[in-house]
Amino acid sequence: AYLLGYELFTSAKFPPTQKMQTLVEINNMIFKCGVGEILDVNLGYRKKAKEKDILKVHRYKTASYTTEGPLVVGAKLAGAKKGLVQKLRLFSKPLGVAFQIQDDILGLFGDERETGKPVGSDLRQGKQTLLILHALQNGSSKDR
């Protein structure tokens, strides 16, 4: 799929400079997502995750490909100036984190028919999410 995507992209009718800048961004997005996956797997081996570590995973793994990458790639292909690209980058990271938090909420309380994801799967897999972290830190002994 990646190779086909690259092939389609390189044959698209954009100026060569824009293509190169965009390919660099796409490669960075893939790299960040990979780093996020490594961080996420590493969190799975820890007994207790810290909020800052979970948020770092969200920024690298989720925000890079759901919000930051697509917005920046689109802006670069549209010929946006560096200042706008930087503003989009800054805007998109917290948006991607919010997306992941919402996904985690739906994973615990959503309707499987709507989400396509089994309710409680993160909990059963021992995944350390912000919701679970805060429930363990702030919940009563009964809630934990």
Descriptions of predicted regions:
Residues 1-141:
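Mg2+-dependent prenyl diphosphate-binding active-site environment of isoprenoid biosynthetic enzymes
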